[in-house]
Design a protein with these regions (language model features):
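Cys-dependent condensing catalytic cores that perform Claisen condensation/acyl-transfer
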Residues: 48
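Conserved beta-strand-loop surface patch within small alpha/beta domains used
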Residues: 1-45, 53-123
Length: 123
């Protein structure tokens, strides 16, 4: 199966408000539709999640730039997360945290992204 990056906009109640996908496993290019959805859903929006189907289990430099722009545009912090084969990482108070229990939408996000969960061993 082909892998692809997928983005989810998650509401305050944990429901998926909107989704977008690319045809590339390493990149989800900016899109006008996504930015319009973010702006239209800004009152309900609590989290922006996306997949890294080929890794890494963490935020890329492009992710960092996007997170900064979103926080600035909305005037408030959001929760950001990355779902990869090895788990889910969220940004909490400026720190990256590997979740021990993933949200309900993590597994469907993996499936749509063309990846399987492959837990990593921690030292």
């Amino acid at each position: 199966m082909t892998t692809r990056e997928v983005c989810l906009l998650i509401g305050r109640d944990g429901q998926v408000l909107w989704s977008d996908e690319s045809d590339n496993p390493f990149l989800l290019p900016d899109s006008r539709e996504r930015w319009e959805a973010i702006w239209q859903l800004r009152e309900e929006l609590a989290e922006v999640a996306h997949s890294h189907p080929e890794g890494p289990l963490g935020f890329s430099a492009e992710d960092e730039s996007t997170m900064s722009a979103l926080t600035s545009a909305l005037g408030r912090p959001l929760r950001f997360s990355v779902v990869a084969p090895g788990g889910t990482v969220v940004r909490v108070d400026g720190r990256d945290v590997l979740l021990s229990e993933e949200p309900w939408w993590a597994e469907p996000l993996r499936r749509v992204s063309g990846m399987r969960r492959e837990p990593i061993a921690l030292a």
